[in-house]
Amino acid sequence: MGQADISRPVNPDGVEEIGQPTADLGMVMDCVEAGDITPPTKRKSKFSGFGKIFKPWKWRKKKSDKFKETSEVLERKISMRKPREELVKRGLLLEDSEQGGEDPGKLSHATLKNGHTTLIGSTRSSSPVQVEEESERIASLRKPVPEEEPKKRLGSSGSQPHSEAEFVPESIPKQPLLPPKRHLSSSHEANEGQAKDATSSGSLARPSSSASTTAITTAPAATMAATNPAKTVHSSGPPSQAPRTLPAAPASTHTTATLSLTHTGPAKQPPIPPPKPTHRNSNPVIAELSQAINSGTLLSKPSPPLPPKRGIPSALVPTSESAAATTATKAPSDQREKSACSVGSEPLLTPSSSPLPAHIPPEPPQSPPFPAKTFQVVPEIEFPPSLDLPQEIPQQESQKREVPKRMLDHSFGEPQVPPRLPPVPLHIRIQQALTSPLPVTPPLEGSHRAHSLLFENSDNFSEDSSTLGRTRSLPITIEMLKVPDDEEEEEQSHIFAFDEDVASTSVIPKLPQCLQEEEEGKESDSDSEGPIQYRDEEDEDESHHSALANKVKRKDTLAMKLNHKPSEPEMNMNSWPRKSKEEWNEIRHQIGNTLIRRLSQRPTPEELEQRNILQPKNEADRQAEKREIKRRLTRKLSQRPTVAELLARKILRFNEYVEVTDAHDYDRRADKPWTKLTPADKAAIRKELNEFKSSEMEVHEDSKHFTRYHRP
């Protein structure tokens, strides 16, 4: 991520100015674009590398003794560096004229280191200790590495998960490619030394001397020296092409690196941590392209693809040519045996795009020999940390040869299938995946190849199921999680898990008619003949299966149940339990009584009409009723007596009607003045009223003596 900030342009004289600041971004990008390569997809920012060197949030946690220890290691290493002339004499460096005469396109091409891009000649400040005595390097490696190194390494590699597929996680992405003369352990130790140097030289700002230009020239020398043997080796591997083609230089650099890593097996090796799964980042398009070329039969290995991501140029996916070259150099006789095993096609296990095949992680020694094709699913806990690579690689190849032979020979008497079959629809492939533990997948064309990545007919699932100690239902490997409890079970159960699958009796489900006709043309070349029995062990292990496998299993179980569904006459016969005629009559009588009782509680239509719930029959009847009511009313009104008749009958006693005058209405309740009167006001009103009565009201003579006011 931050190589562009630490790197410097190649100095053709080999003379390094000590006080020179770091090269700006433009010069580095111009060097990258000098050849006829596709430019990188995403340019790095100018300050992206500062986080690697200056981490003030980490400085709190560091202690001064770690700084002292690192500076002592640095001083000791810098004091023991060889001058440039001695390195040229020993043949580790080229002369300036030879270096200048090389192809500028090859020099300027960005090489792949630990999943990052760096220029071959631009990693100068990070490698002051690259060429030194191997004994001193071993001695410095045995010293305890300070704790700041893993933190820095986490900071650099944790941001790019696709770099984990390169199997050297100790190396920080700043070191150049190692010369091919070196042993494997020494290259690892040099990587660790460089990691120390790079981290502390950024923080301590140590001036470099002229011998640090050795790193610049060793990498092109290694590149050009190993191009010819790599090209001769290429012819033995099967020709294939990667998703994007590369110039010859990066391919040959990969080949030299892997050649040097493969052939030399020293006594001591640092432990190689297993690769983290690249499965979740895998680009299905690249996987399809590489699978179309490399896998001719059902036993050839699908490629673990490295998708171009973030700052990596897309041209950095390494060619399968170089990978094939490494496998060819590893064991040509192995290639012949493997090609004899496979059904008339390319060699069995040709990794199409894994960049360093020498770093295949070792299997646990107690596991039975199954082909170690996919290491994506196997979790980290499985690998013992102290196994040596050179002993493990032949063992693995013998395992890879054993099982496909065993599978092909003992396929339980089934006829061998020719490799080319017509493409099969997805639902039939799901059916086949469910009816056989190792499913049939004919060679795929077109859009079916994407589905084949899910329903893959690989042997890897036999390895996964054996090492993880569980039986197989579907080979859809969607990265199962490893629970710590599984480790205890796995030693007992993985020994007989494979035999149990082979020997299990099975029932062939009845397929629909359309599927049966297609099934007759195809015979399964796997080692079982029927569906998986849903046993009790699988019920216990249901949590381990992926969601997709469970979904497909549910759907297929439902389809099988629907296939076995009885016909309608059978259902009609068996739906009711048989009863005698008397029982049937009794049941009918009870039902009839209940219905009659409920019907009798309903209101009659007359009641409903009276309640105006039920309307009369029709509109004509309704109109007739209205006319009748009107006629009756008019007759009554016409028969009323007049006022004269009423006066004559002395019913009306007045000769005139009461006259009515208009008056404004007012609210009597609101107008209550007497409520607001004081007692004095009330007494005054009463006195006034009494005076009016005594003076103006007339009283009958006979009753005058009853009044107070009218005394005689």
Curated annotation (Swiss-Prot):
RPEL repeats: 72-97, 593-618, 631-656
Biased composition (Acidic residues): 516-528
InterPro entries to which the protein is assigned, alphabetical: RPEL_repeat
Modified residues (Phosphothreonine): T441
A GO cellular-component term linked to this record: lamellipodium
Predominant cellular place of this UniProt entry's protein: cytoplasm
Biased composition (Polar residues): 114-124, 233-243
Sorted UniProt keywords: Actin-binding, Cell projection, Cytoplasm, Developmental protein, Neurogenesis, Phosphoprotein, Repeat
GO process annotations (BP): actin cytoskeleton organization; closure of optic fissure; enteric nervous system development; negative regulation of integrin-mediated signaling pathway; neural crest cell migration; neural tube closure; positive regulation of catalytic activity; regulation of cell cycle
Superkingdom of origin: Eukaryota
Chain positions with Phosphoserine modification: 125, 127, 140, 156, 282, 303, 353, 436, 452, 462, 473, 524, 526, 567, 600, 638
The protein's assembly and partners: Binds PPP1CA and actin.
Function in brief: Regulator of protein phosphatase 1 (PP1) required for neural tube and optic fissure closure, and enteric neural crest cell (ENCCs) migration during development. Acts as an activator of PP1 by interacting with PPP1CA and preventing phosphorylation of PPP1CA at 'Thr-320'. During neural tube closure, localizes to the ventral neural tube and activates PP1, leading to down-regulate cell proliferation within cranial neural tissue and the neural retina.
Protein family: Belongs to the phosphatase and actin regulator family.
Name this protein carries in UniProt: Phosphatase and actin regulator 4
